[in-house]
Amino acid sequence: MTTNKDTRYPIFTFRWLAVHALAIPTVFFLGSISAMQFIQR
């Protein structure tokens, strides 16, 4: 358990990129939607 410290599962290779690739456009999309709704009012 302690020897497998480096080979658990690659968090910083696939899951980190996937989370950021999905989170950044959704935050930008929600921000643009809220800005458009505030501008229309």
UniProtKB/Swiss-Prot annotation:
Chain positions recorded as heme binding sites: H20
A GO molecular-function annotation: electron transfer activity
Cofactor note: With its partner (PsbE) binds heme. PSII binds additional chlorophylls, carotenoids and specific lipids.
Cofactor: heme b
Gene encoding the protein: psbF
Task performed by this protein: This b-type cytochrome is tightly associated with the reaction center of photosystem II (PSII). PSII is a light-driven water:plastoquinone oxidoreductase that uses light energy to abstract electrons from H(2)O, generating O(2) and a proton gradient subsequently used for ATP formation. It consists of a core antenna complex that captures photons, and an electron transfer chain that converts photonic excitation into a charge separation.
Protein's GO biological process: photosynthetic electron transport chain
Name of the molecule in the record: Cytochrome b559 subunit beta
Family, per entry: Belongs to the PsbE/PsbF family.
Swiss-Prot/TrEMBL keywords: Chloroplast, Electron transport, Heme, Iron, Membrane, Metal-binding, Photosynthesis, Photosystem II, Plastid, Thylakoid, Transmembrane, Transmembrane helix, Transport
Localization per Swiss-Prot or TrEMBL: Plastid, Chloroplast thylakoid membrane
Organism: Euglena gracilis
Membrane topology: Single-pass membrane protein
HAMAP family, alphabetized: PSII_PsbF
InterPro entries per UniProt: PSII_cyt_b559_bsu (IPR006241), PSII_cyt_b559_CS (IPR006216), PSII_cyt_b559_N (IPR013081)
SUPFAM superfamilies: Cytochrome b559 subunits
Pfam family, any one: Cytochrom_B559
Assembly mode: Heterodimer of an alpha subunit and a beta subunit. PSII is composed of 1 copy each of membrane proteins PsbA, PsbB, PsbC, PsbD, PsbE, PsbF, PsbH, PsbI, PsbJ, PsbK, PsbL, PsbM, PsbT, PsbY, PsbZ, Psb30/Ycf12, at least 3 peripheral proteins of the oxygen-evolving complex and a large number of cofactors. It forms dimeric complexes.
Principal localisation: plastid
Spans traversing the lipid bilayer: 16-32
One GO cellular component term noted in the UniProt record for this chain: chloroplast thylakoid membrane
